[in-house]
Design a protein with these regions (language model features):
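Compositionally biased, intrinsically disordered low-complexity regions enriched in proline and serine
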Residues: 157, 161, 167, 382, ...
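Short conserved micro-motifs at the rims of enzyme active sites and ligand-binding pockets
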Residues: 219, 318-319, 362-364, 382-383, ...
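Catalytic cores of transferase enzymes with a strong primary signal for eukaryotic protein kinases
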Residues: 69, 408-412, 427
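Catalytic alpha/large subunits of respiratory electron-transfer oxidoreductases
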Residues: 1-346, 350-358, 394, 398
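Catalytic or ion-translocation cores adjacent to nucleophile or general acid/base/metal-coordination motifs
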Residues: 354-376, 383
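Long, low-complexity segments enriched in small/aliphatic residues
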Residues: 254-257, 414-427
């Protein structure tokens, strides 16, 4: 997990560095935030994370966008944070500016609060997990009304003919009409039709919330939203096309000079086995079993020890009952925790780590223009230690202390991170 905005006392980095010093580990692939998108988008657009970092800026939206379609909303509560910390908050400011510049918003979410009230956007409340059906109804309307940009599709896409056969029901006998979509998503057919026409007649930005990936078949809403954006022919136009997760964290849509932040070196993991991030239960319940991922078949390794730091699987994993069953399988579960939470209560060994208030660090990220000194405000409580100190002690007992610390103290490492970032910025 993140655990802290600090660049050095980042629990995952510390854990991975330690494990690589003692022979490696089975890693998790992708993130709980948007793993389905990380898997599907490279097959359609390219690297998902690169697309996030180069999202259409709010400045371009303010100058060019006329209609902003918010699938999953633009929840400002999420935009208060970002990986590595936030110095420049701008999501609320830009939303209000956009509303004052006559950009029309529609919040397509079961939650009205997923779009700022001051924006005065329209609210459409679909049944949860039906966004793809809604988008298929929009696609059908665009085609039936001659609103599809055929020239764009022919020049920049492949496979539209196959997709159209599905939309028209030629492959399964079910035309994806607005009436069909309405019965599933519980937004009436006329509203869906009007939404599609408004999208076609305006410079439209489609924003897809990361939350849409964290549902059954979570890759489908992203794939379908990209398809609708392609049908509109506005991908690549200023203020048009598609964006992923405006205000999912603060940085999406930002435009500023970014320091090229340096991270703590983690070393090389000699172990090739991995699991998709949300399949911990499957890993523990089915050792040596097979699983399909991104078009290939892999095997779950046999797992005897689980080590968790900086996060809590009982907070963000799905199907907690099944996770509880799986949690009984390993021989030993170790965690670094600062409080007696659900993870600590279910671990065999709990090593008390301190909080960001009890250590020195530096907040530094390639997604924010600020570098922030994080001062230690209080002494470490009781026997708690930093993650670095915890792993240093274990590494000492295992004979790899020098390899783990790099013969540096935590202060040395923080200074090194700052100095190396300075060098990259100058270069």
């Amino acid at each position: 997990g993140w655990s802290s905005a600090g660049r050095f006392h980042h629990a995952q980095s510390q854990l991975h560095r330690f494990l690589n010093c003692i022979g490696g580990y089975t890693k998790s692939k992708f993130t709980y935030s948007f793993a389905a998108a990380e898997t599907i988008v490279p097959h359609i657009l390219g690297s998902f994370r690169e697309f996030l970092d180069t999202s259409t800026s709010w400045e371009s939206i303010l100058e060019n966008t006329k209609f902003f379609v918010c699938l999953g909303g633009i929840p400002l509560k999420n935009g208060q944070i970002s990986q590595g910390g936030v110095g420049k908050h701008f999501q609320r400011e830009k939303l209000i500016e956009a509303s004052k510049s006559n950009i029309s918003f529609v919040n397509i979410s079961p939650l009205k609060g997923d779009l700022l009230d001051e924006v005065k956007g329209e609210w459409l409340s679909p049944r949860p997990n039906t966004d793809t059906a809604l988008l298929l109804g929009i696609a059908h309307t665009l085609h039936q009304n001659g609103l599809t940009d055929i020239a764009f599709l022919e020049k920049y896409t492949q496979g539209y003919e196959k997709f159209l056969e599905y939309v028209l029901g030629e492959t399964d006998g079910i035309p994806k009409t607005t009436n069909w979509a309405a019965a599933i998503c519980e937004i009436d057919a006329v509203t869906i039709e009007n939404l599609a026409k408004k999208m076609a007649r305006n410079r439209t930005m489609i924003s897809v919330s990361w939350s849409l990936t964290r549902q059954d078949h979570g890759e489908q809403p992203f794939w379908m939203a990209i398809t609708v954006a392609a049908m509109l022919g506005q991908i690549g136009l200023p203020g048009g096309g598609i964006g992923f997760g405006y205000s999912a964290t603060n940085f999406v849509g930002g435009q500023f000079t970014i320091p090229p932040a340096v991270a703590l070196p983690q070393g090389r993991n000699p172990v090739s086995s991995f699991i998709p991030v949300a399949r911990i239960s499957d890993l523990l319940l089915h050792p040596n079993g097979t699983f399909d991922f991104d078009g290939k078949e892999y095997n779950y390794p046999e797992t005897k020890i689980v080590y968790w730091a900086g996060g809590n699987p009982f907070h963000h994993h799905q199907d907690l009952g099944r996770l509880m069953q799986a949690w009984q399988k390993p021989d030993t579960i170790i965690c670094n925790e600062w409080c007696w939470n659900s993870l600590a209560k279910r671990s065999d060994i709990v090593l008390p780590c301190n909080t960001p208030l009890e250590r020195e660090d530096i907040a530094l990220t390639p997604r924010d223009p600020y570098v922030v000194k994080m001062s230690c405000l209080i002494e470490s409580y009781g026997e708690s230690k930093t993650d670095f100190e915890i792993f240093q002690g274990i590494a000492r007992a295992m004979g790899v202390e020098s390899k783990f610390t790099g013969e540096k103290t935590s202060t040395d490492w923080i200074e090194w991170l700052y100095e190396e970032t300075q060098k990259k910025a100058v270069a």
